[in-house]
């Protein structure tokens, strides 16, 4: 229970961290049930204290902000999140609010699949783009990969503009086969089918996506110009276009019918082809939907009725510590194997050491294990009556299990702060090279992985010592590609200070905080906790994280700063951006250009532009090369400004 505004602000920061791990890193720290409980407490506090509500509260936004390496793409109509209900009384209260005003309302119920939400845009019957949910307003453009999902039609009979939305999932059977393949290849296993679906959809190599046997199950539409009267009619229309039908779909008139269908799904969930975590309930009549409208985050005409967790008893026989992508240490219990919902469970997350202490969980305890939402196994509580004296306290580690570095222990999480820790080094370098950091073109995760395998790099400093002959050893590297990467690495020297600070990947310090820190000069990271706390927007966790990070990596940071020679200010860059005709404009590139489109896209983004893959009424400029195709006609229809490559180069030159 949240008791003060300070606790409220801490809860927002904590939930946003969890959301980032879940949506962007595919690396959930806690189970769905724990997140839901924390979220509901936050929501209850805000209902009692509406004047305290913050814009960055998870109740005010959907999902998480999209991250690299995929381009951002806006949805034509927002993708909303659903409010959850957890029991009969909550469902009854939700239904009564609707039926009191609209007694004739009916409800469409369907299984809630636990996958990755995807928005497909069709125009003139062709698949134009596929975009993940992201923050609800824009997501990641994954069109090339989505086209390898067998049951996504590349063409449909309807010729108007329409967004078709659904869930990308992997079946239980295919998930088990995939993990078996990875086990045989000594590759890390996917924690659950949702992670497998997300990771497969976001592959840089579309051939990998093609092999993963993903499926797309539609559940609704976004923008369209059709005149449906009911939600059921809309779903039937989607199926008529060649999409897969939703199993166990039902139309219900009252609470009793909904409960009957809910319990039918619970009985059938074990034999269902994919993992489920509840039932979606949507008002069928579209005129009633329109009148009910939306909250800041969710539609008032739909909800997700969550399933109860599946639980069994077993024994903790050991504990290991895993190092996540951000350096977070997650204790994992080794269990006597127990079957839950058809899966043999021999491990379960303990989340963090604060959770272990709070629940008084001990080694050799008999415990209650649940699979919350059919995904991450979790230990809910110890069965203290079974204790026989053989139990021992689970000690919080003091050093990293991988690199033996001293750990940073916060109130809830424990982190490895060592940038050279092998468990987090690869992800740190991917972040180091990313668009919001040093923006090194061509240095993606596959290249970094090869560099590690060939023992050519250990940390970011090694990137700047690479030679042409080093890169020529890598798969698919020829002289031109190798030289381009070397040039891009050298070009990243002398960056704006905020970019280098952000590239370090310091816990709790993102792009905005890095820009604030850069205002204090090149020696800013040497400041004390008290000095950091005086900076606008900096709290205790951020200040401590900075101090501990610098203390652990002083030598590395000094060497990196000396080598890269960051600029104390990028005022010229900001001035150029603000005076640019492209600043805050949405731009689409099409056709064959003399340079790669990505190169032009990067130039325009540096000038404040937003790059999109599809033309709409919101597009400001269309940049056309040879064989521009249908996008040119669409731009002319919407009155979009069209520039050829020569005109674009002229405008770019004027800004130099």
From Swiss-Prot:
GO terms for biological process: DNA repair; DNA replication. GO terms for cellular component: cytosol. Its cofactor is Mg(2+); Mn(2+). GO terms for molecular function: DNA binding; DNA ligase (NAD+) activity; metal ion binding. The keyword Ribosomal protein does not apply. This is DNA ligase. NAD(+) binds at residues 32-36, 81-82, 133, 167, 306. The gene is ligA. Residues 577-656 form the BRCT domain. It is an enzyme of class 6 (ligase). InterPro entries: BRCT_dom, BRCT_dom_sf, DNA_ligase, DNA_ligase_AS, DNA_ligase_CS, DNAligase_adenylation, DNAligase_N, Hlx-hairpin-Hlx_DNA-bd_motif. It catalyses: NAD(+) + (deoxyribonucleotide)n-3'-hydroxyl + 5'-phospho-(deoxyribonucleotide)m = (deoxyribonucleotide)n+m + AMP + beta-nicotinamide D-nucleotide. Zn(2+) binds at residues 400, 403, 416, 421. Keywords: DNA damage, DNA repair, DNA replication, Ligase, Magnesium, Manganese, Metal-binding, NAD, Zinc. Its EC number is 6.5.1.2. Belongs to the NAD-dependent DNA ligase family. LigA subfamily. Pfam families: BRCT, DNA_ligase_aden, DNA_ligase_OB. It comes from Helicobacter pylori (strain HPAG1). SUPFAM superfamilies: BRCT domain (SSF52113), DNA ligase/mRNA capping enzyme, catalytic domain (SSF56091), Nucleic acid-binding proteins (SSF50249), RuvA domain 2-like (SSF47781). DNA ligase that catalyzes the formation of phosphodiester linkages between 5'-phosphoryl and 3'-hydroxyl groups in double-stranded DNA using NAD as a coenzyme and as the energy source for the reaction. It is essential for DNA replication and repair of damaged DNA. The active site is at residue 112.
């Amino acid at each position: 229970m949240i008791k003060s505004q300070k606790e409220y602000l801490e809860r927002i920061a904590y939930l946003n961290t969890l959301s980032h791990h879940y949506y962007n890193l595919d690396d959930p720290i806690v189970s769905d049930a724990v997140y839901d409980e924390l979220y509901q407490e936050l929501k209850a506090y805000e209902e009692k204290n509406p004047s305290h509500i913050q814009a960055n509260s998870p109740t005010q936004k959907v999902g998480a902000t999209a991250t690299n390496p995929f381009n951002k793409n806006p949805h034509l109509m927002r993708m909303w999140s659903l409010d959850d209900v957890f029991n009969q009384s909550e469902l009854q209260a939700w239904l009564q609010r609707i039926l009191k005003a609209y007694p004739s309302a009916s409800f469409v119920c369907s299984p809630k699949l636990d996958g990755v939400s995807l928005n497909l845009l069709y125009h003139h019957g062709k698949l134009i783009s596929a975009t993940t949910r992201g923050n609800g307003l824009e997501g990641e453009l994954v069109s090339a990969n989505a086209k390898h999902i067998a049951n996504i039609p590349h063409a449909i009979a309807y010729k108007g503009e329409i967004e078709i939305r659904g869930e990308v999932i992997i079946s239980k059977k295919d998930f088990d086969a995939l993990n078996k393949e990875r086990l045989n290849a000594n590759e890390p296993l996917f924690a659950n089918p949702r992670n497998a679906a997300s990771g497969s959809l976001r592959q840089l190599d579309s051939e990998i996506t093609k092999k993963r046997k993903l499926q797309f199950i539609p559940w609704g539409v976004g923008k369209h110009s059709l005149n449906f009267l009911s939600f059921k009619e809309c779903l039937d229309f989607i199926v008529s276009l060649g999409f897969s039908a939703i199993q166990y779909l039902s139309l219900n008139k009252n609470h009793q019918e909904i409960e009957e269908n809910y319990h039918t799904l619970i009985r059938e969930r074990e034999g269902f082809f994919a993992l489920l975590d509840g039932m979606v309930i949507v008002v069928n009549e579209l005129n009633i939907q329109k009148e009910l409208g939306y909250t800041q985050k969710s539609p008032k005409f739909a909800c997700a009725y969550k399933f109860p967790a599946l639980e069994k008893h077993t024994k903790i026989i050991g504990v290991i510590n895993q190092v996540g992508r951000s350096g977070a240490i997650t204790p994992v219990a080794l269990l006597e194997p127990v079957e839950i919902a058809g899966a043999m469970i021999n491990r379960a997350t303990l989340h963090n050491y604060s959770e272990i202490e709070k629940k008084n969980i001990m080694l050799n305890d008999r415990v209650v294990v649940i699979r919350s939402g059919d995904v991450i196994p979790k230990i809910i509580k110890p069965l203290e009556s079974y204790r026989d004296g053989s139990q021992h306290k689970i000690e919080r580690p003091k050093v990293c299990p991988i690199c033996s570095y001293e750990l940073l222990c916060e109130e809830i999480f424990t982190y490895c702060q060592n940038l050279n820790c092998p468990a987090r080094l690869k992800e740190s370098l991917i972040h180091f090279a990313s668009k919001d950091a040093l923006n090194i073109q061509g240095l993606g995760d596959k290249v970094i992985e090869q560099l590690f395998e060939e023992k050519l790099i250990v940390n970011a400093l090694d990137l700047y010592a690479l030679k042409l002959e080093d890169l020529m050893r890598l798969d698919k590297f020829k002289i031109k590609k190798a030289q381009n990467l070397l040039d891009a690495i050298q070009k990243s020297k002398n960056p704006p200070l905020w970019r280098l600070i952000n590239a370090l990947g310091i816990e709790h310090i993102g792009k905005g905080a890095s820009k604030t820190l850069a205002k204090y000069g090149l020696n800013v990271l040497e400041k004390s906790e008290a000095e950091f706390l005086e900076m606008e927007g900096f709290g205790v966790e951020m200040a401590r994280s900075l101090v501990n990070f610098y203390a652990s990596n002083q030598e590395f940071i000094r060497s990196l700063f000396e080598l890269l020679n960051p600029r104390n200010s990028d005022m010229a860059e900001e001035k150029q951006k603000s005076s640019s005709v492209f600043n805050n404009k949405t731009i689409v590139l099409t056709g064959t250009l003399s340079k790669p489109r990505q190169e032009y896209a990067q130039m325009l983004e540096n000038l404040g532009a937003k790059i999109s893959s599809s033309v709409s009424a919101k597009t400001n400029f269309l940049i056309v090369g040879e064989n521009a195709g249908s996008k040119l006609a669409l731009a002319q229809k919407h009155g979009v400004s069209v520039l050829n490559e020569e005109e674009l180069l002229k405008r770019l030159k004027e800004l130099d």
